């Protein structure tokens, strides 16, 4: 049997709907001369099973899911998933018979047609690069139980909402609160008696105090906190605050009153934190917030206590500290690469409290560990306040007064 005879015999088993025929034959004359016939009123398309003729019902199914979820969006992307071997097998065979080598398959057609319907009927905007929601059209062989449309009973709709990103600044007004969630050291976050089955080492975190207000407002799933650096648990963040971006995952409500969010967080945190300067940003902003430590500068207020009395010459030498070579501190080497990093001090102001205690105001490049700048960290920080005075010192109190990052 020749290839032509084989193709002719195969065409007797197939018929196409107008849309599938038009996909394969873009030229009307070619469609008129197609070796595969057009379906009649009793037939179903050999490729799409008449799904393309019932796209209005697919749209209604999408609309029903949007209303059920009460999901808000302005931009969208349509995705398709076909788990139906009959469709994929027949499409491949018909492409071979008709010598079709284009890329306008059934998935492309559904995406294009449904996108057009959503734009026209809902006034939404198709966005391939940065959609607010992704609408997945899933097609399988077996029918779905709760699909109300017999013609497309094997179609189901899933909608995923992409994250929203809100930038702001937080002030941490008390000590003893970490910035982000800290899994319990006993159960590793699983929940145990030691952590009251919360899975967390600390009851409150900056992230939790914000997310417990923002999640109900957005109907989001969870949050991820992106800070411009972080202060230690025993350190306060004062001044104008530390820049952060909070990422809300799977939000159903995207536009919330940020002024009201600020009021809620500030009034419900029992004086532990305050947030300000809230605004919506794109996902690119979280990277610039997190990776800004080298370009940024910070101002600290530190209390340094010395083993022996401090002289006026010691104070003079401390104020002259400039370039610091700092090896990764012992206390954080378990989570940071063991490297020597060079950081610059812009200015140090020293105020004597008593003969063995100084108040330091330090303006320095981001990424400098202040506690180790004072103690020397077993000579891993060179020079240090301890080494320059030949007098061992410890930081007994530390506050961050300012965090500056480039816009």
Curated annotation (Swiss-Prot):
| Xref: Gene3D superfamilies | 3.30.70.2510, 3.30.70.3190
Asked if the record carries the keyword tRNA processing, the reply is yes
Which reaction does this chain catalyze? uridine(54) in tRNA = pseudouridine(54) in tRNA; uridine(55) in tRNA = pseudouridine(55) in tRNA
GO MF terms here are:
tRNA binding; tRNA pseudouridine(55) synthase activity
The UniProt keywords, alphabetically, are: Isomerase, RNA-binding, tRNA processing
- Catalytic residues at 232
Task: Tell me the domain of life.
Answer: Archaea
InterPro entries noted in UniProt: PsdUridine_synth_cat_dom_sf (IPR020103), Pus10 (IPR005912), Pus10-like (IPR039894), Pus10-like_C (IPR048741), Pus10_THUMP_arc (IPR055174)
* Gene Ontology process terms (BP): tRNA pseudouridine synthesis
SUPFAM superfamilies for this protein: Pseudouridine synthase
Q: What EC number(s) does this enzyme carry?
A: 5.4.99.25
Give the matching Pfam families. Pus10_C (PF21238), Pus10_THUMP_arc (PF22023)
Broadest EC class?
Answer: isomerase
| Sequence positions that bind substrate | 300, 369
Annotated NCBIfam families: pseudo_Pus10arc
The UniProt family comment states:
Belongs to the pseudouridine synthase Pus10 family.
Q: What does this protein's UniProt record list under function? A: Responsible for synthesis of pseudouridine from uracil-54 and uracil-55 in the psi GC loop of transfer RNAs.
Please state what the protein is called: tRNA pseudouridine synthase Pus10
Species annotation: Methanosphaera stadtmanae (strain ATCC 43021 / DSM 3091 / JCM 11832 / MCB-3)
